[in-house]
Amino acid sequence: VNDHGLPDQRTVLYVHGGAWFQDPLENHFEYLDLLVDALDARVIMPVYPKIPHRDYRTTFELLTKIYKRLLTKIDEPENLVIIGDSAGGQIALAFAQMLKKEQLSQPGHIVLISPVLDATFKNPEARKYEKEDPMLGIDGSKYLVELWAGDAPLDDYKMSPMNGDLEGLGHITLTVGTKETLYPDAVKFSHMLNDKGIKHQFIPGYNLFHIYPLFPIPERQRFLEQLKKIIVTKEL
């Protein structure tokens, strides 16, 4: 979407969510249009392989091919942005860590919208928040992520990216609703980054729900304006 064919154009690689088995929803395509306007960016959203027919390995191979190709089309990796929501947020952060291991350039920014950060779902606080979350349940999510993991342990960074090497990644922006199952892990993750001295932006969606920026509510526009300040004008 919005490809000007220019090497200095900001480029977003968007990794959509969907519990590792769903293709993008209409909300995703609407959100891409908003990202184009807010960031004046070219946006690419691959429909990656999913469970039950594939696991994470096939998707990481696809994303690596796409990312390497993007690196040849832009002047500066700083102009690359990886965004992921929900399961896509998990994939986005894990993929950035894999890029580091493969000694490939980091994107300028990594934006995580209600990401799955710990696939073991062992945080006891998560059960309390689950009672208020109409969208995401722990037991069902754990069953699906086990299929996605294949033979990888659930505590491996590719499944639980908060367990990985977080140094030297692109600038992380994290948003999550305070009324969702994943909120406690997001808070824990932000504290971890602070403890490591890693600059990042943590934007809680107060009294909001899972992947709230994908829905037509006022807070969506507010988050887009914050993203623009972080990525485009660099005011935050």
Language-model features and meaning:
Residues 1-2:
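A short loop-to-beta-strand scaffold at the N-terminal edge of the catalytic core in hydrolase folds
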Residues 5-236:
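Alpha/beta-hydrolase superfamily serine-hydrolase fold, recognizing
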